[in-house]
């Protein structure tokens, strides 16, 4: 049976997969927030094992209708470890029945009682942060190349990865970019290769053969995207001459160039950094019999007859979210024909070697400053591969191995690689605000105390070492990360939400929620937020916007949009306004003028980027309902109202126009990729969208004008609650880079609690 381990206990043992040990793990705070799964064959009662088998069977049977796991393995474990003693009857409200405060209060207590049982001992809420389907392949390819696949991933790990891939294979035989997406060559070719590397035969369960047919029917693997071409090249089933150039020498260019990688969005920068190393070395792993076989399986013509030059720009129409503009094709052709032939030979090759050394310096800096977690799963495995390519026996490679487990999560649909090492801090700050909104927070002092400790101990206390300008890093001291302090990358909205949470908790007695954060640390957080405001008033994610929008012309990733620079977002900007406004109320004398100017500019930015129909586009959640919540909440925090601000007026009208006839809101991920509001299939409501819309409208004073939509939405949330106080997992609600969805599994609990809490206190009690 699989067991979730948290925090310090994760450093004991090897994660059940071999290769990891306490010797090769580093931590700033005793692994706070770390979450790994271990397999223990002796664990589990017959009843628990049957529960797990039943959950797996139900997922398989409904896999084409319900793509998202319900995170049941974790819930089964916590039900045994933290049983709830509360016995509050379930509430259901008929369509003709009035929503009463008593019913809302009972629903909230049942919800928080349950949610408290799935809180980890260290104070955060673990959960599934999967969704993308292109992450596990990079890991399996890297482990296969380095000869550590079977040594590091146990047969149980490999079995669960195969289960996950089979569960999320589409009916046509392919795999999408994410669990709810239609089949793409990127997803299908990579996951097909993954199954083969894991030992599945060419006709495995009929599904492998079906996947190969999809690949061949769509032109073969030469039509995979540029990221896919890179992975296939290092594996040895595609030639480097079929890639557009990624010259590492760009890292030697002066920073004043607008296209310098140091000016790019950090995720983009940190992915193309190791890619440029592998490209510059033309690195290829061992050519095994499986690799030889894959060369025959993946293409419509014999491998030696493929026109690799033509394949450089070949991309399946199913993958083409961001087609290459002409200027990009000209750039790649120039580098391919004129630049690369020179730098492959002496004397220019000496400059390449210098560039490769520089790239490896930056890779090691990233590794060391994230305790070998890295900023995300893509550069995690790429950096690990680069360390092995540099020296297979290096300490750096050994330090990478145990941190793989930080990214692996298991649910009833199998084992997946998450989009980060978790969403620990982010979810915890939202959970705190949700519980506090209910006005019954004192009843859950132990839950809040543990969450408070987690948030306090996850704040980044030091800047990265060395010259930050040389390493292209922003200040970190005082910031909060998305996940753990060991990860450590500072983020604007995480810092804002962390600051909001600790300020709100400071209003409670320390006997209830623990000691407040030292005021100097609040000042540090404010300093980070103020330092991240761009000249247009907006806030980006990790850093200031360092270059120009036109740089997107050289975005080589056909699958993703707006990845080259760190753009300002309504979500990040709103969070900054909210945090600074809250801070200013308690500490009015600290940098008052700077804070007021920052808030004013940020509010103006939010107004300026609003669409003419009253909407904002959500870049990190689905989609217009998510952004609408942030947009309205930010403007209200800045002092705007429905009466004196046309932006809030228009935003409310927009949200109300999207309310479903049955009540509530239900927005499809298609809104993100198509940039047009799209309802879920059959116009179903979604509890998370409904929660966001409710919170936005309540903040904008909808209860004073017409509370009817709020009553209907509250009824949806109350009636959605499950018998044990949990809420159902519905469609995927997270997004990044416009086109890829990601799971925020905690949202199903957080936002019904938050919305009903605000509804109870600000709507029902105001009537």
Curated annotation (Swiss-Prot):
Gene3D superfamilies: 1.50.10.20
PFTB repeat intervals: 158-199, 522-567, 599-639, 648-689, 710-751
Enzyme class, broadest EC rank: isomerase
One annotated GO molecular function: cycloartenol synthase activity
Active site: 493
GO biological process: tetracyclic triterpenoid biosynthetic process
Entry's EC annotation: 5.4.99.8
Keywords assigned: Isomerase, Repeat
InterPro entries: SQ_cyclase_C, SQ_cyclase_N, Squalene_cyclase, Terpene_synthase_CS, Terpenoid_cyclase/PrenylTrfase
One annotated Gene Ontology cellular component of this protein: lipid droplet
Annotated region described as Disordered, given as residue ranges: 1-22
Catalysed transformations (reactions): (S)-2,3-epoxysqualene = cycloartenol
Family: Belongs to the terpene cyclase/mutase family.
Function according to Swiss-Prot or TrEMBL: Oxidosqualene cyclase converting oxidosqualene to cycloartenol.
Protein name (record): Cycloartenol synthase
Provenance organism: Betula platyphylla (Asian white birch)
Gene expressing this chain: CASBPX1
């Amino acid at each position: 049976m699989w067991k979730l381990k948290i925090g310090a206990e994760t450093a004991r043992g090897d994660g059940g997969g071999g290769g990891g040990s306490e010797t090769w793990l580093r931590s700033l705070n005793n692994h706070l927030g770390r979450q790994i799964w271990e397999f223990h064959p002796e664990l589990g009662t017959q009843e628990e094992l049957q529960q797990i088998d039943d959950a797996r069977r139900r997922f398989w049977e409904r896999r084409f209708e319900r793509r998202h796991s319900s995170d049941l393995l974790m819930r089964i474990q916590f039900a045994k470890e933290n049983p709830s003693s509360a016995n509050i009857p379930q509430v259901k409200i008929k369509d003709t029945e009035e929503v009463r405060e008593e019913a809302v209060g009972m629903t909230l207590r049942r919800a928080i009682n349950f949610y408290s049982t799935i809180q980890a001992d260290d104070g955060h809420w673990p959960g599934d942060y999967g969704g993308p389907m292109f992450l596990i392949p990079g890991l399996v390819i890297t482990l296969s190349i380095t000869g550590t696949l079977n040594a590091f991933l146990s047969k149980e790990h490999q079995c669960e990865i195969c289960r996950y891939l089979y569960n999320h294979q589409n009916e046509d035989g392919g795999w999408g970019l994410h669990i709810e997406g239609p089949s793409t060559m990127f997803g299908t070719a990579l996951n097909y290769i993954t199954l083969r590397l894991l030992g599945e035969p060419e006709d495995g369960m009929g599904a492998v053969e079906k996947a190969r047919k999809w690949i061949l029917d769509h032109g073969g693997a030469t039509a995979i995207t540029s990221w896919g071409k890179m992975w296939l090249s290092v594996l040895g089933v595609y030639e480097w001459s079929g890639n557009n150039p990624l010259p590492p020498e760009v890292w030697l260019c002066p920073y004043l160039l607008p296209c310098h990688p140091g000016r790019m969005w950090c995720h983009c920068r940190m992915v193309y950094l190791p890619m440029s190393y592998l490209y510059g070395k033309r690195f290829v792993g061992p050519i095994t019999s499986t690799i030889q076989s894959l060369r025959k399986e993946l293409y419509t013509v014999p491998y030696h007859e493929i026109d690799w030059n033509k394949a450089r720009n070949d991309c399946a129409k199913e993958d083409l979210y961001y087609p290459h503009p002409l200027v990009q094709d000209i750039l790649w052709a120039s580098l391919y024909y004129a630049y690369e032939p020179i730098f492959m030979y002496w004397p220019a090759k000496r400059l390449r070697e210098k560039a490769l050394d520089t790239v490896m310096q930056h890779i090691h800096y990233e590794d060391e400053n994230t305790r070998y977690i890295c900023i995300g799963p893509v550069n995690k495995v790429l950096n690990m591969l680069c360390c092995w390519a540099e020296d297979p026996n290096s300490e750096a490679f050994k330090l990478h191995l145990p941190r793989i487990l930080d990214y692996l999560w298991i649910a009833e649909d199998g084992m997946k690689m998450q989009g980060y090492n978790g969403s620990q801090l982010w979810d915890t700050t939202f959970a705190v605000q949700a519980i506090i909104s209910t006005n019954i927070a004192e009843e859950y002092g132990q839950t809040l105390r543990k969450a408070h400790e987690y948030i306090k101990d996850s704040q980044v206390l030091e800047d990265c070492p060395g010259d930050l300008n040389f390493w292209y890093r922003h200040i970190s001291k005082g910031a909060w990360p998305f996940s753990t302090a060991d990860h450590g990358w500072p983020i604007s909205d995480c810092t804002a939400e962390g600051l909001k949470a600790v300020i709100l908790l400071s209003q409670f007695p320390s006997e209830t929620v623990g000691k407040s954060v030292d005021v100097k640390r609040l000042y540090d957080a404010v300093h980070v937020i103020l330092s991240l405001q761009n000249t247009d008033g907006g806030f980006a994610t990790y850093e200031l916007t360092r270059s120009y929008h036109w740089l997107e012309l050289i975005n080589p990733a056909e699958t993703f949009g707006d990845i080259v620079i760190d753009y300002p977002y309504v979500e990040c900007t709103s969070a900054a306004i909210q945090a600074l406004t809250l801070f200013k109320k308690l500490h009015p004398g600290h940098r008052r003028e700077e804070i007021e100017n920052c808030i004013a500019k940020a509010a103006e930015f939010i107004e300026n980027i609003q669409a003419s129909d009253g909407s904002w586009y959500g870049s990190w959640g689905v989609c217009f309902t998510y952004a609408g919540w942030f947009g309205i909440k930010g403007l209200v925090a800045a002092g705007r109202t429905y009466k004196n601000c046309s932006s809030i007026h228009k935003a409310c009208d927009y949200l109300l126009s999207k309310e479903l006839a049955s009540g509530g809101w239900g927005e499809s991920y298609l809104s993100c990729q198509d940039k047009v509001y799209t309802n879920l299939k059959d116009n179903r409501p979604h509890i998370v969208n409904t929660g966001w819309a409710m919170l936005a409208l309540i903040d904008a004073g909808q209860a004073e004008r017409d509370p009817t939509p709020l009553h209907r939405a509250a009824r949806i949330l109350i009636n959605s609650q499950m018998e044990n106080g949990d809420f159902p997992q519905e469609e995927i609600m997270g997004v990044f880079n416009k086109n890829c969805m990601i799971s925020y599994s905690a949202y199903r609990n957080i936002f019904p609690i938050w919305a009903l809490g605000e509804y109870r206190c600000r709507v029902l009690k105001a009537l």
